[in-house]
Every structure is written in structure tokens, then in C-alpha cells.
Amino acid sequence: MDGVTVIDHPLVQHKLTIMRKKETSTGSFRRLLREISTLLCYEVTRDLEMTMETIETPLQPMESPILEGKKLVFASILRAGNGLLEGMLDLVPSARVSHIGVYRDHETLQPVEYYFKAPEDISERLIIVVDPMLATGNSSIAAIDKLKERGAHNIRFLCLLAAPEGIANFRAAHPDVPVFTAAIDSHLNELGYIVPGLGDAGDRMYGTK
């Protein structure tokens, strides 16, 4: 699928299977999400630009590769997006963090925005927007609309699960933003949930309903 990368690493798929199980506890779900987010982050950042820097090892000077440019921004769509942040920050602790408060109205399935906080210079940084689920796509589209309004243009979207309907909506709205996901499931049900999915990621992560 154009513009969409499915991260099918065996460890990602193994952990995702355990997360899908309805009997998986809140604590286990949260731990697995942190672990899987590290693996997903590894894949979504594999083509970052590098530059050479002169350093000194205990034995001699050398030219060695280092990340080029300003630090990354991880933009979390609240609240479930925060579950992906911990593992990603373990891997890239110097990253800046943005929070975008968007929730889906369960009657209209439309996004409702209530919070936005991001570095002032986001136009100069690569932004990785994170949300475990790309269902209808409405919340992620609204979040990226907001980032673009603030000048962001180098954006990637990372999720755990995606529905074909959400991918189609997202790609129509933001064809310039690549999507990275661990799996593309069958469809959305009448309530807008991904099927077979894993339930409501935020509720399973925080033990709420």
C-alpha cells in the first residue's frame, strides 16, 4: 500500500498478539506497549540523516557517524499516545515531546480538540506523531492539521493498528505523511472500533472504561 509501511518484525508481531488477547492484564498490556514502541521507533527512524564527527576514543581520534540536525519531536495524541512515548524516549531520550489533546466523540466519531503544546521551532524538526490506533483517522488527521498550521512539514505517523478505512481517510487528507504500523486489520465496526483489533487501547492501558 502506497505510503504505508507494515512493521512485521517477529518480535513486534509476537508482542502484538499477546496485547490483543482479552485476558492480558492492564500491567502486562502497558509493559508490552512500551516494549513494542521501542521496536517500532527503531523502524520509523532507520533512515535518519547522519553526519560525521571527529571524536576521540581511549586509543585515538576517529571520524564517527552521529545524527544530523535538530532533535526529533515525538507528538503524542492524548491520551493513548502517551503509552508509546516511554519506549520511544528510552531509545531517543533527547527527543522533544509535543502533546495534542484530541478525543473522538463516540456518537459522531468526529475529533474534538482540547489541548495543544509543541516546540516553537517545529518547522525545523522531524515530527513523529504517535497514536496506538488509526481507526477512522479523524483524530490523527486533526492533529496533523494542527501541526501543519504551526509550520510543521516533515511529519511521520506511527501507530500500532490501522483499519483500511482509516488509512484511506488519512492518506486522502495527508498524502505527504507516511504511515508506519504493526498491522492492518480487517475493518471498522459500526461503533468505529478496529476489528479484530485489541479493544480500546487507552482503556486497556489505564484500566478504565
Curated annotation (Swiss-Prot):
This is Uracil phosphoribosyltransferase. Gene3D superfamilies: 3.40.50.2020. 5-phospho-alpha-D-ribose 1-diphosphate binds at residues 79, 104, 131-139, 200. It comes from Rhizobium rhizogenes (strain K84 / ATCC BAA-868) (Agrobacterium radiobacter). One of its GO terms (biological process) is UMP salvage. Uracil binds at residues 194, 199-201. Allosterically activated by GTP. One of its GO terms (molecular function) is uracil phosphoribosyltransferase activity. The gene is upp. Binds 1 Mg(2+) ion per subunit. The magnesium is bound as Mg-PRPP.
